[in-house]
Amino acid sequence: MHESVQNYYGKVLQNSSDLKTSACCDASSMPAWLKPLLSQVHPEVSARYYGCGLVAPALLDGCQVLDLGSGSGRDCYVLAQLVGASGSVLGVDMTAEQLAVANAHLDYHAERFGFANVSFRHGYIEDLASLELADGSFDVIVSNCVINLSPDKDSVLREAYRLLKPGGELYFSDVYADRRLADELRQDEVLYGECLGGALYWNDFEHLARRHGFTDPRLVEDQPISITDSALAEKLGDARFYSATYRLFKLDGLEPACEDYGQAVIYRGSIPGAAHAFVLDKHHRIETGRVFPVCGNTWRMLQDTRFAPHFQFIGDFSRHFGLFEGCGGGLPYDRQAAVTAATSCC
């Protein structure tokens, strides 16, 4: 599928309106504080970028960031402003045409930002070892609707875990299905290029993440995807797809389930862009100044990561009270509020 994807994104598509679906289009509004950063990106870079939304977790100042499937470099140039002069951003992509756009504007952005902290490499996201990147060299790894295009997602997650520093995270948006797709759908080149044919069944993805050390995958946000192209909808039948953002932490001590140790945290309100509340994931919106009960895993995700200075921690692991209330299974995504977009994107 590599050649097919390279052709689709390098030659067939010229801008996002050429796509046939809104798969991997993030319907959530972009935070106001990010919009000025996006306006600093060169127009050609933005025009040749086929994703929607922006994959940017909080608190990136000084971080070393890796973008998997960086395309024309739009997200990299936004992230460059967030990590600042003391941080760095590396984009990896397999499509020569996209990399040419990204590299053509390195000097433009360095002059605009006042520092040069972005670089791009040609490579495959499932074969990062060939780029000779050192173990534990990144604080954060991001990806915007690209992992579904990889024919070897197992290797992508294994390499991401290897490259993250302890306490680091893989923060990414992608497309997931509510079932395992038939072979003929997974081999369909148009469906694959539109980010649908390569979509994992959500439960298979979570098992895969756990197998590679990401013990407690956290869903940040999600939206159902509308398949508005009638021919594609006919092929897909009753299969349903979701655009979802996950964060996967590389942390020792995480447990398979959310266990209750009587712990709590208090958010200090000190993270830039999150004065009133910090959103860890879909089920954890932590208001400033409020005592917020948490499970042991959430405690570690806050205490053993870059977020620790922004919280007060109450309790420890000395006493166990059983399973944390509300920890369960089932389809994690919302079935309502289907994604709609004025222009298609992937």
UniProtKB/Swiss-Prot annotation:
Keyword line: Arsenical resistance, S-adenosyl-L-methionine, Transferase
Gene3D superfamilies documented for this protein: 3.40.5.100, Vaccinia Virus protein VP39
Protein purpose: Catalyzes the transfer of a methyl group from AdoMet to arsenite, producing methylated arsenicals. Involved in the conversion of As(III) to dimethylarsenate as the main product in the medium and also produces dimethylarsine and trimethylarsine gases. Reduces the arsenic toxicity in the cell and may contribute to the global arsenic cycling.
Reaction(s) catalysed by this chain's protein: arsenic triglutathione + [thioredoxin]-dithiol + S-adenosyl-L-methionine + 2 H2O = methylarsonous acid + [thioredoxin]-disulfide + 3 glutathione + S-adenosyl-L-homocysteine + H(+); arsenic triglutathione + 2 [thioredoxin]-dithiol + 2 S-adenosyl-L-methionine + H2O = dimethylarsinous acid + 2 [thioredoxin]-disulfide + 3 glutathione + 2 S-adenosyl-L-homocysteine + 2 H(+); arsenic triglutathione + 3 [thioredoxin]-dithiol + 3 S-adenosyl-L-methionine = trimethylarsine + 3 [thioredoxin]-disulfide + 3 glutathione + 3 S-adenosyl-L-homocysteine + 3 H(+)
Induction context: Up-regulated by As(III).
One term of GO molecular function: arsenite methyltransferase activity
Taxonomy, superkingdom: Bacteria
InterPro entries, sorted: Arsenite_MeTrfase-like (IPR026669), Methyltranfer_dom (IPR025714), SAM-dependent_MTases_sf (IPR029063)
Alphabetical list of PANTHER family matching this protein: ARSENITE METHYLTRANSFERASE
Use of this protein: Could be exploited in bioremediation of arsenic-contaminated environments.
Disruption phenotype: Deletion mutant cannot methylate arsenic and becomes more sensitive to As(III).
EC number in record: 2.1.1.137
GO biological process, one term: response to arsenic-containing substance
Family, as annotated: Belongs to the methyltransferase superfamily. Arsenite methyltransferase family.
Pfam family, one: Methyltransf_31
pH dependence of function: Optimum pH is 7.5.
Keyword S-adenosyl-L-methionine: yes
Record's protein name: Arsenite methyltransferase
